C-alpha cells in the first residue's frame, strides 16, 4: 500500500503549486528505489525547499513560465515510465489545484500547446499544382497547359473536345401523352425538335415570296421518271398524262395516284408561262416516300417541317389515309413536291375538323350524352329510384330516348310488354337500333356461360347435328373469348314482321321511332288516344320549353295526359331554371322563347295537377350523379283510374 503522511507545510504547498524540478527529483528517486511492478511506499515529508520553489514560481516572468512548461512536459514523460498508482496520485494532487491558476504542464494545456506549433505544408507537388489545387485540376481548363503536361507522359487526362452543337430537345406532340401510347399509328410517333422548326421568320419569308411570284419550287425532288407515272410539263400549257398502272396496286394506291395528279395539276396552273419546268412523279416511289425510314423522305420531311408548322399535322396524319378519306392522301404529293405556302392552307383546311361548323344540338340531341352524363358507369343511376313493378308487363313510352341505353335496360331487365323509344334526331334513333345488337351480344354471352356449365352433364344427350354446330363454333371462335369478350360480330337485328319471341321478351319488346312529340296546334290533341301505361320524360322539358315556349310545353303535357291509360304513371325529370341560361343563345328562336317564358320548372307540379288533370304526384328521389348538374329530382304523377272519373 501507499502510505501518505501529510504535514502542515505540505498541505500549504498543495494550495499553491509545486516546483516541477522538485517533482522531477522525487519521481526519479521513487522510480530508482522501487522498480515497476512492485508495491511502493511513498512518504511525503516536510521539505524546506518546497516553499522556496513555490515563491520562485510565483514571481517568475513569462520566460520562466515557458521554461517551466518544458520542464513539466519532461516530468510528465518520466512519470509515464513510473508505476500506475504513483501517476494516479499526481493526478489527484493536480486536480486539487485552484481553478484560477493553470499550470503550464497541465494535460489539456500541454496538448493545446503542441497543436499550436506550426505545421510544415508540402511544397513539391508531382502534378504541378499548389496547396489549393494539389491535383492540378485547373490545368485542364487551359488547352496549352494541358498539351504541355501531356507532351512527355500523360500525367493528367486529356481535355475532351467541347461539343459546340446545341443539345436537341424532342418535344412530343401531345404533352399529356409523351410516349404516344394513345395513338395506334406510327406516323404520329415523330417528335418535334425546336432546333429544326426553323422559326417564324423563314415561314413569313416563304409566304411573302410565294404570294408575290406564285412560282413552284421543285428543289430537292429526287424522283426518277419510269413507267406507270404521271408527267407534268409546263410549256405555257399544262399536260397531265397517265400511263399503265400496275394491276397489283390496291385501291388505296390508285386514289393516292389520283390525288398526286390533282395536286401536281394545280401547281402547274399557278406557274408562269415564261418559266419552263419538268416534274416527274414515280408511282412506286411515291408510296415508298411515305415511309419515315427512307432517307430522302426524311430530308424532305425536315425541310417541310422547317418551312411551316402546319406541315407537322399533315405529315402526322398521313398514316390515317384510309380513315381520313381521299383528301388526306394528297399529303404524300405535298411532301414530295414542296409547293408554295399559298397551297398549304387549302390542304390543311380540308383535314382540320375544328374548321368545320360545330353542331349546335338545338334540341338537346347530344350524340355522346350518356358518355359524359354517366362516365365509367355501366348503368344509369336514375334506374335506382324507379320500381321495376311499374314496367313489368306494361306498355311504356320513353320520350327523348337519345341512343336508347335507358330504354334498352328497361326492356331487357324489367321485361315490359312493349317499350317505344322516341327521339327527334334520326341519327340517334339509328344508333339506338344498333345498340340492340350490343345488348343481344350480352345475352349471348350469358347463354354461352350457362351452356358451358351444363356441357359436361348434357354431353351424352346431344344429337349429331348439334355436335357439328358445336365443332364449327369451336373452330371458328374460341368459347372462352365469346364468354369474356362477346362475339366478333353482333347478332342481326330481329325482323319486325316475325313474332317468334313471345311478348315481353327482349329484343321483341323494344322499338325506336323518330318523331316530334310536340303537336303543331291544340286541335290535334282531340285526336290523341290512350295507348300507354307508363310515360318517361327524363331531362327533356328544357328543350321543349326553349324551342316551343310555354305554349309548346303546355301542349306537350296535355298530350302526355291523353296518351296515358287510366291509372297510368308519368315519370318526370325536369331541368332546373338555372340551366336554361346556358343555352339561350343557340338560335334566335330559342333566345326569343327564353325571354318570353313565364311557366318556370318549379311550377310544373301545380300546373300538371290543377290544369292538366293528374290526380296526385310524389317525389320518388334524386339521382346520385358525380356532377351536381345532373342531380335532378324525379317526380311520379298518377292519372285517375277509370272508375273514379
Curated annotation (Swiss-Prot):
The keyword Methyltransferase applies. Residues 199-210 have a biased composition (Basic residues). Disruption phenotype: Transcription elongation and RNA splicing defects, as well as aberrant anterior (brain) morphologies. It is found in: Nucleus. InterPro entries: Bin3-like (IPR039772), Bin3_C (IPR010675), BIN3_SAM-bd_dom (IPR024160), Methyltranfer_dom (IPR025714), SAM-dependent_MTases_sf (IPR029063). Its EC number is 2.1.1.-. Residues 309-324, 349-361 have a biased composition (Low complexity). GO terms for biological process: positive regulation of protein localization to Cajal body; positive regulation of snRNA transcription by RNA polymerase II; RNA methylation; snRNA metabolic process; snRNA modification. Pfam families: Bin3 (PF06859), Methyltransf_31 (PF13847). GO terms for molecular function: O-methyltransferase activity; RNA 5'-gamma-phosphate methyltransferase activity; RNA methyltransferase activity; S-adenosylmethionine-dependent methyltransferase activity; snRNA binding. Residues 1-118, 194-220, 263-361, 444-477 are annotated as: Disordered. Residues 380-642 form the Bin3-type SAM domain. CDD domains: AdoMet_MTases. Keywords: Methyltransferase, Nucleus, S-adenosyl-L-methionine, Transferase. GO terms for cellular component: nucleus; ribonucleoprotein complex. The keyword Methyltransferase applies. Coiled coil: none annotated. It catalyses: a 5'-end triphospho-guanosine-ribonucleotide-snRNA + S-adenosyl-L-methionine = a 5'-end methyltriphosphate-guanosine-ribonucleotide-snRNA + S-adenosyl-L-homocysteine. S-adenosyl-L-methionine binds at residues 370, 382, 400-402, 423-424, 516-517, 538. Residues 1-10, 450-473 have a biased composition (Basic and acidic residues). PROSITE patterns: BIN3_SAM. Residues 15-45, 56-68, 75-89, 263-273, 282-292, 325-348 have a biased composition (Polar residues). Belongs to the methyltransferase superfamily. PANTHER family: 7SK SNRNA METHYLPHOSPHATE CAPPING ENZYME (PTHR12315:SF0), BICOID-INTERACTING PROTEIN RELATED (PTHR12315). S-adenosyl-L-methionine-dependent methyltransferase that adds a methylphosphate cap at the 5'-end of 7SK snRNA (7SK RNA), leading to stabilize it. Also has a non-enzymatic function as part of the 7SK RNP complex: the 7SK RNP complex sequesters the positive transcription elongation factor b (P-TEFb) in a large inactive 7SK RNP complex preventing RNA polymerase II phosphorylation and subsequent transcriptional elongation. The 7SK RNP complex also promotes snRNA gene transcription by RNA polymerase II via interaction with the little elongation complex (LEC). This is 7SK snRNA methylphosphate capping enzyme. It comes from Danio rerio (Zebrafish). The gene is mepce.
Amino acid at each position: 500500500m501507499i502510505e501518505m503522511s501529510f504535514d502542515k507545510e505540505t498541505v500549504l504547498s498543495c494550495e499553491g503549486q509545486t516546483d516541477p524540478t522538485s517533482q522531477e527529483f522525487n519521481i526519479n528517486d521513487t522510480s530508482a528505489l522501487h522498480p515497476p511492478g512492485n508495491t511502493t511506499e511513498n512518504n511525503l515529508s516536510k521539505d524546506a525547499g518546497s516553499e522556496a520553489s513555490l515563491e520562485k514560481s510565483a514571481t517568475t516572468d513569462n520566460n520562466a513560465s515557458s521554461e517551466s512548461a518544458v520542464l513539466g512536459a519532461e516530468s510528465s514523460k518520466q512519470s509515464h515510465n513510473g508505476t500506475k498508482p504513483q501517476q494516479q496520485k499526481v493526478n489527484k494532487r493536480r486536480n486539487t489545484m485552484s481553478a484560477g491558476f493553470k499550470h503550464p504542464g497541465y494535460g489539456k494545456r500541454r496538448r493545446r500547446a503542441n497543436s499550436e506549433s506550426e505545421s510544415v505544408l508540402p511544397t513539391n507537388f508531382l502534378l504541378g499544382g499548389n496547396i489549393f489545387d494539389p491535383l492540378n485540376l485547373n490545368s485542364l481548363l487551359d488547352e496549352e497547359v494541358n498539351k504541355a503536361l501531356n507532351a512527355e507522359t500523360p500525367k493528367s487526362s486529356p481535355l475532351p473536345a467541347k461539343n459546340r452543337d446545341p443539345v436537341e430537345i424532342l418535344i412530343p406532340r401531345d404533352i399529356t401523352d409523351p410516349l404516344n401510347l394513345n395513338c395506334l399509328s406510327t406516323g404520329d410517333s415523330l417528335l418535334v425538335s425546336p432546333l429544326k422548326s426553323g422559326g417564324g421568320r423563314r415561314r413569313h419569308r416563304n409566304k411573302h415570296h410565294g404570294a408575290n411570284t406564285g412560282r413552284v419550287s421543285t428543289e430537292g425532288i429526287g424522283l426518277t421518271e419510269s413507267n406507270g407515272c404521271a408527267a407534268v410539263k409546263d410549256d405555257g400549257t399544262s399536260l397531265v398524262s397517265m400511263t399503265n398502272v400496275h394491276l397489283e396496286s390496291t385501291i388505296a394506291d390508285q386514289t393516292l395516284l389520283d390525288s398526286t395528279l390533282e395536286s401536281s395539276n394545280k401547281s402547274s396552273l399557278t406557274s408562269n408561262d415564261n418559266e419552263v419546268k419538268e416534274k416527274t412523279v414515280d408511282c412506286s416511289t411515291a408510296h415508298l416516300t411515305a415511309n419515315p425510314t427512307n432517307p430522302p423522305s426524311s430530308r424532305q420531311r425536315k425541310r417541310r417541317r422547317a418551312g411551316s408548322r402546319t406541315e407537322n399535322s399533315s405529315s402526322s396524319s398521313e398514316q390515317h389515309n384510309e380513315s381520313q378519306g381521299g383528301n388526306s392522301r394528297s399529303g404524300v404529293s405535298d411532301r414530295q413536291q414542296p409547293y408554295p405556302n399559298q397551297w398549304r392552307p387549302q390542304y390543311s383546311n380540308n383535314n382540320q375538323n375544328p374548321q368545320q361548323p360545330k353542331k349546335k344540338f338545338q334540341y338537346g340531341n347530344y350524340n355522346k350524352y350518356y358518355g359524359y352524363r354517366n362516365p365509367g358507369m355501366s348503368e344509369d343511376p336514375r334506374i335506382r329510384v324507379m320500381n321495376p313493378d311499374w314496367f313489368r308487363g306494361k306498355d311504356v313510352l320513353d320520350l327523348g330516348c337519345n341512343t336508347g341505353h335507358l330504354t334498352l335496360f328497361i326492356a331487357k331487365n324489367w321485361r315490359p310488354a312493349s317499350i317505344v323509344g322516341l327521339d327527334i334526331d334520326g341519327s340517334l334513333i339509328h344508333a339506338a337500333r344498333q345498340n340492340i345488337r350490343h345488348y343481344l351480344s350480352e345475352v349471348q354471352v350469358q347463354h354461352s356461360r350457362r351452356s358451358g356449365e351444363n356441357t359436361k352433364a348434357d354431353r351424352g344427350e346431344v344429337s349429331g347435328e348439334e355436335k357439328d354446330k358445336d365443332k364449327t363454333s369451336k373452330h371458328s371462335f374460341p368459347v372462352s373469348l365469346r364468354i369474356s369478350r362477346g362475339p366478333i360480330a353482333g347478332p342481326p337485328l330481329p325482323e319486325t314482321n316475325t313474332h317468334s319471341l313471345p311478348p315481353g321478351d327482349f329484343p321483341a319488346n323494344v322499338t325506336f321511332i323518330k318523331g316530334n312529340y310536340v303537336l303543331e296546334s291544340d286541335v290535334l290533341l282531340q285526336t290523341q288516344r290512350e295507348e300507354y301505361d307508363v310515360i318517361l320524360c327524363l331531362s327533356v322539358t328544357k328543350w321543349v320549353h326553349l324551342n316551343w315556349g310555354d305554349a309548346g310545353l303546355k301542349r306537350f303535357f296535355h298530350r302526355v295526359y291523353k296518351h296515358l291509360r287510366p291509372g297510368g304513371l308519368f315519370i318526370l325529370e325536369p331541368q332546373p331554371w338555372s340551366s336554361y341560361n346556358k343555352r339561350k343563345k343557340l338560335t334566335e328562336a330559342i333566345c326569343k322563347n327564353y325571354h318570353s317564358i313565364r311557366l318556370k320548372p318549379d311550377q310544373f307540379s301545380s300546373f300538371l295537377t290543377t290544369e292538366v288533370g293528374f290526380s296526385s304526384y310524389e317525389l320518388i328521389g334524386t339521382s346520385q350523379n358525380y356532377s351536381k348538374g345532373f342531380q335532378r329530382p324525379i317526380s311520379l304523377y298518377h292519372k285517375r283510374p277509370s272508375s273514379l272519373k
